Design a protein with these regions (language model features):
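Active-site cofactor/cluster-binding pocket
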Residues: 2-266
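Gly-rich Lys/Arg/Thr-decorated short loops/hinges at beta-loop-alpha junctions or inter-strand turns
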Residues: 21, 158-160, 227-244, 262-269, ...
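Thiamine diphosphate
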Residues: 21-109, 257, 271, 278-374, ...
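Short glycine-rich or small-residue beta-strand-to-loop segments that form or flank ligand, phosphate
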Residues: 22-29, 178-180, 270-273, 320-323, ...
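A glycine-rich phosphate-binding loop feature that marks nucleotide/adenosyl-phosphate handling sites
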Residues: 58-59, 214, 235-239, 275-279, ...
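Short gly/pro/ser/thr-enriched loop/turn and capping motifs at secondary-structure boundaries
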Residues: 59-63, 122-126, 155, 304-306, ...
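Conserved thiamine diphosphate
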Residues: 88, 143-145, 149-153, 363-412, ...
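Flexible, low-complexity linker and terminal segments
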Residues: 248-258, 266, 396, 401-625
Length: 625
């Protein structure tokens, strides 16, 4: 929280503090609606003109016992005047809807931050379920923060006493009281919040009305008891945002939109063959809503079928996609290799999660990098891309589709649970401004001279002939093919040639140069990362630069092939540290690709994003060595 200036606004004894940024964390039981409250608050903030970055954090259990520590769900929102790169390490305002939430989440609140609690949920039975040893949780936890205690449950019950709703339904509205109070504390747009609720519950107007009534009660509560609250806050707007229309979007939705845009640009139908798996399922759900845009989705019987059906769709002339997470990629690998052998365009989306095996389904890691690069039998090169942020998922999904279509190859797109579920303010692009996509469809005049594996001499990719094109009938399959003719072949020299041709095609796909941020010319330390860690590494870079350290950042989004200038960039610096959410997979890969460099490592495998403060501490230690 960066204070810009302070002033009294004259509405009471409280002081309104003007801020450049502010972080709110909603927490409660998994059924308390913390994700909804956080999403509405982030959307309202984006509508107001602020930049945002969010972090939904929920347990891997389908439903832990109510009121227990293992069942706590949280949603953190970082609102800023200027560009916000991370959800923040700790919050300025914590909402704890019960005793368990306070016990597990207070450590995420800054020492000077405030905590809102529902005092009705701190009874003896609640404290016992939350594993307290005394009847004074504040003292037991050593909390020194300002506590805003509110009887939220009682107020909500009174508010909806005449609604005709049952008790369970009434209690589901508690999150809106907390949201209303937060909106008052931060001078947020209540009308925008109400409109979101009306839209969400459009088919249940009584539910919408109840939630809006409770939302207003929370806001009014703040107005009526302002004398007991030390500060209210207002995050300023007017930062250096590009003009245009913005929306609050999470990474999975942005990925879906990027794929739709690519299909539109290429003039193709979009096909998704998928099997539900956390945290990738929302891509399937989102694409299923857009049949009117030429999108076909099939929820298949298993992961293998999802990928195999997508290969079939690619043969049929569609932009073909299959979506999953790490465990699903294990199952899809043979079908992915079928796309390698047949040289058909396919986008394989891996929304990475904690592993191995079932692992941590709702948590984030980057541990599938080497799987994406090498996790198939045989010499099976695939382009591998990694999105850097929730909004970047749109552009990298579009780019993955473009590369797949133009170079007739399967492409792996890596995102992760953090950026897939987190959100940011997305500037909606015009379709005309996006790069052209030109699939290499066989032309009518090639009839007679065409063969199934005839290649474009410039790109090395074969031409795309689809069923129904007279004179271009052919078959494909997983057995090795003869060069050009596509006939089955076991001849040794032909296998070597085809292996080399497939590798050459992928290795020579043009990708943008690797850019360096920070003290690019005279840095003593270069930080290297990839994918969804960009925001945290960028924030750590800013912190180090502000203290006079000579550091730079090179963040990879194109992993295979690497940018042509990668070796040249890395060799400029005396020291290079690779920071990643795994045991060192990118560092190992770079050692294979770039000789003569000692790569230092900063690795974390906790199922959580990086902490900016810990990154700064670690990089400072490396600098001081």
């Amino acid at each position: 929280m960066n204070k810009n200036k302070e002033k009294h606004v004259g509405t009471g004894n409280e002081e309104t503090v003007q801020l450049d940024d502010f972080i709110v964390r909603f927490s409660g039981d998994s059924g308390d609606g913390m994700q909804l409250a956080g999403n509405i608050f982030s959307t309202v903030s984006a509508i107001a003109g602020n930049d945002i970055c969010t972090f939904p954090n929920y347990p891997a259990d389908i439903r832990a016992p109510q009121g227990t520590r293992s069942g706590v769900s949280a949603f953190q929102v970082h609102v800023g005047k200027k560009t916000v790169y991370t959800p923040g390490d700790k919050c300025d305002l914590l909402v704890a809807m019960n005793a368990a939430a306070l016990a597990t989440q207070y450590k995420f609140c800054k020492p000077e931050g405030a905590i809102i609690i529902d005092t009705d949920c701190f009874k003896e039975s609640d404290l016992k379920k939350a594993e307290y040893s005394t009847d004074d949780p504040i003292t037991e936890l050593g909390i020194k923060n300002e506590i805003i205690g509110v009887s939220i449950t009682s107020i909500v019950k009174d508010c909806l006493a005449d609604s005709g709703m049952d008790n369970k339904s009434i209690l589901k509205c508690r999150n809106m009281f907390a949201l209303g109070l937060v909106c008052w504390l931060l001078d947020s747009n209540m009308e925008a919040a109400k409109e979101i609720l009306r839209d969400k519950f459009a088919r249940k107007p009584a539910v919408a009305d109840a939630n809006i009534k409770v939302l207003e009660a929370g806001y009014d509560f703040g107005s009526n008891v302002h004398a007991s609250i030390e500060h209210t806050y207002r995050v300023e707007t007017g930062g250096a945002k590009r003009p245009g229309k913005y929306m609050d979007i999470n990474g999975n939705k942005a990925t879906a939109y990027g794929l739709i845009a690519a299909a539109e640009k290429a003039g193709l139908r979009l096909y998704l063959g998928s099997y539900p798996i956390t945290p990738a399922t929302d891509v399937l759900h989102e694409l299923a809503k857009h049949k009117s845009l030429g999108v076909a989705t099939v929820q298949c019987e298993d992961e293998i079928a999802g990928c195999a059906s997508a290969v079939g769709a690619a043969f049929g002339g569609a932009l073909a996609v299959t979506s999953t997470s790490g465990p699903g990629v294990c199952l899809k690998s043979e079908a992915m290799n079928l796309a390698v052998m047949t040289e058909l365009p396919l986008v394989v989306l891996n929304v990475q999660r904690g592993g191995p095996s079932t692992g941590l389904p709702t948590k984030s890691e980057q541990s599938d990098l080497l799987q994406a690069l090498f996790g198939r039998n045989g010499e099976s090169p695939m382009p591998v891309l990694a999105a850097a942020s929730p909004t970047d998922c749109f552009y990298m999904a579009y780019e993955a589709a473009r590369i797949a279509l133009e170079h007739m190859t399967p492409v792996v797109l890596l995102t992760d649970a953090f950026i897939a579920n987190g959100s940011g303010a997305f500037l909606i692009p015009q379709i005309a401004d996006l790069p052209q996509i030109n699939p290499p469809f066989v032309k009518e005049e090639q009839q007679g001279a065409w063969t199934p594996y005839l290649r474009n001499p410039e790109t090395g990719c074969r031409y795309w002939a689809t069923p129904g094109m007279k004179g271009f009938e052919h078959v494909v399959g997983g057995l090795e093919k003869s060069n050009e003719t596509g006939e089955i072949s076991g001849e040794p020299h032909n296998h070597q040639l085809m292996t080399d041709l497939r590798a050459h095609k992928v290795a020579n796909i043009p990708v943008p140069d690797l850019e360096v941020e920070g003290a690019a010319d005279d840095a003593e330390l270069l930080i290297v990362g990839f994918g969804g860690t960009y925001g945290h590494l960028h924030s750590a870079l800013d912190s180090l630069l502000s203290k006079g350290e000579k550091v730079a950042l090179a963040h990879l989004k194109y992993i295979n092939p690497l940018p042509k200038n990668t070796a040249e960039v890395l060799r400029r610096y005396k020291r290079v540290v690779v920071a990643e959410l795994n045991g060192g997979q990118l560092a190992s890969y770079l050692r294979m690709k770039v000789e003569g460099i000692h790569f230092e490592q900063y690795n974390q495998v906790m199922g959580q994003p990086f902490s900016v403060s810990k990154l700064v501490e670690a990089f400072n230690e490396i600098i001081r060595k």
